[in-house]
Amino acid sequence: MSVITKVTTYDFRFPTSATFSGSDAMNPDPDYSSAYVVVSTDAGDSGNGFVFTIGRGNDVVVRAIDSMSETLIGRNVEELLDNMRLAWDLFVRDSQLRWLGPEKGVEHMAIGAVLSALWDLKAKRAGKPLWLLLSEMEPEELVATLDFRYLTDALTAQEAIDILRAAQEGKAERIAHLKEVGYPGYSTAAGWLGYSDEKMVRLAKQETEVMGFKQIKLKVGQNLEDDLRRLKLAREAVGPDIAIAVDANQVWDVPQAIEWIGKFKDYDLAWVEEPTCPDDVLGHAAIQKAIDPIPVATGEQMQNRVMYKQYLQAGSFKVMQIDATRVAGPQEIVLEYLLAKKFGVKVCPHAGGVGLCEAVSPVSYTHLTLPTTPYV
């Protein structure tokens, strides 16, 4: 038997605002940051987790993670790792902690970092990357770790098992393909709003011609004339065969979004991302209906599985963009993938930032190897 002996946190920050990297209409000066946690045991091993932020407030998340150390220190490691649903319940269903959410905000993100660290430790002890550990779990075993409270009007545990069972066929081939080819992605490197036209065009060509990306994304929403000019320049730079998405980062009201997006109709958009407030389920539904067939994409600031359920039930988007560090770790992400499969919605997780690509990789790879739903 081993026990958890130490929970160590770090406040990492990078001055990305100095070069406008990460800049958009809502967040013009982000300093990419990470609230990082290491959960250590008396056996000498450890698991790592983190939360991505954009600067101020990163210390608040660190303190929230610190506050959970008393729940972990002294715990039997094997008891937790053998029953990850118990680990989930310790934090998500804590009768006092949940008052701070419930299941949203700093408290929920901090829980996600801790649960991710435990999953990381579980994978290390199994001698496998986390994505492979998840992919190789039997459907019943994986579903037993999941919390279906508030979801059963949309997805039951048995439906989840059936979805995963149906995905077993061809899984070995998909795992082999993933190991050989990797997971598809797109680039936002050219698209930050603070970049000059010249820099945007240069990077758009570099990302597509040199790096080989088949899709780029531009930030929009600050000035319509600028958006139209940049879209025109980007399309001329990359040609007709490269997909272009745009991202407004929640800056528009609903009528404004519909009007603004209407001006983009000539640019064959892959999707319009975060057109309005992430809590506005019906507003997104109205936008999706108005701009169809252009897909609405959103999810990076959705706080929990219940929000995803409501978005899906309302037909509010066509592309789900889960943020791996905003929700409560791998278990909640798997639930959201299963919901996407149930409702036939594509998935393209939120990435970039400090560590987000690394955080989303295990669940993205799992998503591809299961697979639970079509991916973008």
Language-model features: locations:
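Proline-centered helix-kink/hinge sites
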Residues: 15, 275, 295, 370-371
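Catalytic core of soluble alpha/beta enzymes
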Residues: 218-354, 358
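Single conserved hydrophobic/aromatic residue that forms the stacking wall/gate
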Residues: 367-376
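N-terminal capping/lid subdomain adjacent to the active-site entrance of alpha/beta enzymes
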Residues: 2-244, 249-258, 262-266
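Substrate-binding cleft/loops of secretory-pathway carbohydrate-active enzymes
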Residues: 357-365
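Active-site pocket-lining/capping segments in soluble small-molecule metabolic enzymes
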Residues: 176, 364-368
